[in-house]
């Protein structure tokens, strides 16, 4: 394992943070979209629906590429067991903390808002379990997937150095055209798996834990591995940080196809399978778009950016119940969708930042929401 730290990737830190924070306008716009959610405005907005669809079509694919990149970077820095422990603690502890402190109260709130408290006793044991699985994992699903990907990638990451010893990467072999074909085929494979499950045992697709543990992991594992490969091969990383007109145009066409599928597709037909193919290739092309823009605009050190990089996970964790509270109790009193959307951003972001500052002053909460053990004062003094 290397003891020499890799150069700081400021633009990747920034992109990861902004993708996390983008969850706030994503969920607030969901209130005002045509999509059915826990809470919705009286009249939907077409432009907020379009905005919401655009974010949804690529955000998490790019996020998992960055996660794979940093995961492999740390894999080279730590012994295997320590690497796994650190990575799982960093995402597992905040996830387990957020369930009783955030998503459980959120679930109780929604039961009263949607007037479902009287129906709860009538549900079967499985229906209660499945409802809790969906509602308690909620927006924390990506943390669960990261824990699974970290565990699964032990074997993959261990195999990478062995492969490097026996073969040398060829720049021509990892072109964006070839990657596009590979991800198209991966999207087709995922669609085929989903269709087979739909034919053989369709009910399992409505199971919350199966969706998070199996389906979401299967979809995002190629992006996670791609991120690790981008760290291993500088030429591959350079392809993503260099603007590509083909990727930009391809992403635009893919988004139009995504919208058409949303508009005319049917869940009983091939809508979800088609969406998986579209978002697989669009996610790849948006990696180039986002990385190249980020490399040009965000590749610098800034105290303000560092603040939001450090705060992004906490803000993301607390924003969801705040958004639902806003949608349930404040949205009905604002007639304008635009004003409601802007007020929602101010409301959620403002309270989230206040809560973030409060939690920084409580060591136990700071540990629980970050997964990072506190640095002992004695150690700091010794270093100083």
Swiss-Prot record:
GO MF, one example: acyltransferase activity, transferring groups other than amino-acyl groups
Protein name: Glucans biosynthesis protein C
Membrane topology classification: Multi-pass membrane protein
Enzymatic class: transferase
Transmembrane regions: 17-37, 54-74, 91-111, 140-160, 173-193, 212-232, 240-260, 274-294, 311-331, 338-358
Gene: mdoC
GO biological process, one term: glucan biosynthetic process
Superkingdom classification of source: Bacteria
Localization: Cell membrane
The protein's Enzyme Commission number: 2.1.-.-
This protein's pathway: Glycan metabolism; osmoregulated periplasmic glucan (OPG) biosynthesis
Keywords: Acyltransferase, Cell membrane, Membrane, Transferase, Transmembrane, Transmembrane helix
GO cellular component: plasma membrane
Family: Belongs to the acyltransferase 3 family. OpgC subfamily.
Primary role: Necessary for the succinyl substitution of periplasmic glucans. Could catalyze the transfer of succinyl residues from the cytoplasmic side of the membrane to the nascent glucan backbones on the periplasmic side of the membrane.
């Amino acid at each position: 394992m290397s003891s020499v730290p890799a150069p700081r990737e400021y633009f990747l830190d920034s992109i990861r943070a902004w993708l996390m924070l983008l969850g706030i306008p994503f969920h607030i716009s969901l209130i005002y979209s045509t999509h059915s959610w826990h809470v919705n405005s009286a009249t939907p907005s077409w432009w907020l629906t379009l905005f919401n669809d655009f974010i949804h079509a690529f955000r998490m694919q790019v996020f998992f590429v960055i996660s794979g990149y940093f995961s492999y970077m740390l894999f080279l820095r730590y012994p295997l067991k320590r690497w796994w422990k650190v990575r799982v603690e960093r995402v597992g502890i905040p996830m387990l903390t957020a369930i009783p402190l955030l998503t459980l109260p959120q679930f109780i709130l929604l039961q009263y808002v949607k007037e479902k408290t009287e129906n709860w006793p009538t549900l079967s044991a499985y229906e209660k379990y499945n409802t809790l699985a969906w509602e308690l994992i909620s927006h924390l699903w990506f943390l669960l997937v990261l824990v699974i990907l970290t565990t699964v990638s032990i074997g993959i990451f261990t195999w990478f150095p062995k492969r490097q010893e026996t073969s040398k990467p060829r720049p021509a072999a990892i072109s964006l055209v070839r990657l596009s074909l590979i991800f198209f085929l991966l999207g087709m494979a995922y669609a085929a798996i989903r269709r087979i499950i739909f034919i053989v045992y369709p009910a399992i697709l409505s199971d919350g834990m199966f969706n998070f543990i199996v389906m979401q992991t299967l979809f995002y594992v190629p992006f996670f591995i791609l991120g690790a490969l981008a760290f291993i091969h500088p030429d591959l990383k350079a392809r993503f940080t260099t603007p590509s007109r083909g990727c930009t145009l391809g992403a635009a066409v893919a988004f139009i196809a995504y919208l058409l599928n949303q508009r005319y597709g049917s869940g009983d037909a091939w809508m979800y399978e088609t969406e998986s193919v579209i978002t697989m290739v669009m996610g790849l092309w948006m990696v180039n778009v986002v990385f190249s823009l980020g490399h040009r605009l965000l590749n610098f050190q800034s105290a303000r950016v560092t603040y939001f990089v450090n705060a992004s996970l906490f803000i993301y964790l607390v924003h969801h119940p705040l958004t639902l509270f806003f949608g349930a109790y404040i949205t009905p009193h604002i007639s304008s969708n635009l004003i409601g959307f802007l007020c929602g951003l101010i409301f959620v972001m403002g309270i989230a930042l206040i809560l973030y500052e409060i939690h920084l002053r409580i060591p136990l909460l700071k540990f629980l929401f970050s997964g990072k053990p506190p640095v002992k004062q004695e150690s700091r003094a010794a270093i100083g």
